[in-house]
Amino acid sequence: MNITYVPEIHRTDKQHTENLRHWRKILGIAPFVSIVFPAIMCLIFTKDRFEKSPFLKFIILLLPFSYSAVQYALLRTNWKSDNKPEGILQSILYHTLSLLLLAFAAISILSITAFTLDKWESSESIFFSIVLPSFFIPPTYLLSTSCRLVPGQIGFTDTGINVLIDIPILLCPLVSLVLIIALEETECCYYSAIISSVFILIRLLREKYSPSEKSTLPTAPWRVAILVLILTLAALIYAFMMWGSMDILNDHFGLLNKLKRVFPFTNA
């Protein structure tokens, strides 16, 4: 009985590995295209076209948010398959990170529906097609390519010149987010989108033609700190997107009013 069962497990694991490699090839150029394609569409079509065409809005949103959803789903799958929690602290970390990655994927899918339903007025077409992708694509890309989520080796793994390339990829959305919150400055986001896409393209080309080694040494504190910074930035951005999505869906379907009718105590 066991003799016939072992090869089946081996074939399943091998197929799983091949599927992951296949997805990595598909997602290779996706982060760059996810920023550039919506920006090009925004420049080609007038603002009136976006207001009148939900399908056009859906096409613009589909690529970046689909990349985000698929990438976080893969990260969660790898995290769950490669890790078995031992002890209370590891169990808390395991389930917290698993839920966080799942939440990022779910918010990405929810955002496609919500932002398509929203009315894109004045400069909102620029925000949804240029500004927003330049916020969430960089941390998603860095988490999937430059970080390791393995117990004992959790942290930022890039070395050499890749570190210098990763710095502007990380700082662009971080600086833009601070400027928007503190100064309500949005023009800088256009430059952030350009800089992020350029450095992501440089990183993609370098990985294709001159891949560098990853750090295999015991994780240094600064590497863990960078991973925490990337996760924190991603959490803030996706929390903002979830809030925006729920607000839009509430305006369209009156979700808050329905919730109050179902749970009368929420009126208090």
Curated annotation (Swiss-Prot):
InterPro entries, per the entry: UPF0328
Entry's family note: Belongs to the UPF0328 family.
Protein name: UPF0328 protein ECU09_2030
